[in-house]
């Protein structure tokens, strides 16, 4: 089922197991994983919807992500993020929510319209479901924190989640940067090393957990990220909506 088309790029929902295998293969490559199946797959693939962005000229899958919908926060403990974060603060959330995960783009693709197509599709989904909160895990490549100290310092200073929504520590290995990091931020360096997807979320008013999880399986550090739709700056929202 087609969601949206931007130029030569089309976003659609996966409609077969073959589609899901294609997404898992792209994720495997993008995330630099290593296993005999050459797929990035887990149990959540069976319960999520998969959004595929294809180049209609080459008929090639170039970007994908998956979503999991919630009517409210009551069942947020069944989300992927809840494996790593204590999300009890969000259980009383009354509005519809969507978890977004496994976002990746083919490394050979440099056209910014691909990301715009992905966001236009997500905007369509959010609007149709009257979603108020998008959430997920935003990853930093690798598990060595030193490269990202300025980025974490910037998150600490400007983007920590409000108290009533803030996830608590659950994972065994974390970097509690809000407490343990005594570091004066170099903003230029912080933005340079900040993951591009997280930068996009932050520009739309997103907030993050006060700690990062060390994910040895994916070989990443990640922070819980929440974005309240009603708080997205109008200029940013219009940029995406104009594509739909």
Predicted regions and their residues:
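Long, contiguous binding/interaction regions
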Residues: 233, 237
């Amino acid at each position: 089922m087609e969601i949206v088309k931007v130029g030569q790029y089309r976003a659609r929902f996966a409609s077969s197991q073959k589609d899901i295998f294609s997404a898992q293969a792209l994720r495997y490559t993008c995330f630099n994983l290593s296993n005999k199946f050459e797929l990035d797959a887990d149990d959540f693939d069976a319960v999520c919807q998969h959004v595929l962005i294809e180049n209609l000229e080459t008929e090639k899958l170039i970007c994908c992500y998956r979503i999991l919908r919630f009517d409210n926060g009551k069942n947020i403990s069944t989300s992927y993020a809840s494996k790593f974060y204590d999300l009890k603060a969000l259980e009383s959330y009354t509005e519809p929510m969507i978890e977004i995960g496994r976002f990746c783009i083919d490394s050979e693709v440099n056209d910014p319209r691909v990301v715009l197509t992905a966001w236009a599709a997500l905007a369509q989904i959010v609007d149709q479901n009257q979603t108020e909160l998008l959430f997920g895990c935003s990853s930093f490549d690798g598990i060595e924190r030193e490269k990202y100290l300025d980025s974490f310092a910037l998150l600490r200073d400007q983007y920590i989640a409000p108290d009533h929504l803030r996830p608590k520590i659950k994972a065994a290995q974390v970097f509690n940067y809000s407490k343990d990091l005594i570091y004066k931020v170099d903003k230029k360096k912080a933005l340079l090393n900040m993951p591009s997807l997280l930068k996009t979320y932050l520009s739309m008013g997103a907030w993050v957990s006060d700690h990062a999880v060390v994910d040895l399986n994916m070989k990443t550090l990640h922070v819980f990220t929440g974005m309240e739709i009603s708080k997205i700056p109008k200029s940013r929202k219009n940029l995406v909506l104009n594509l739909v």
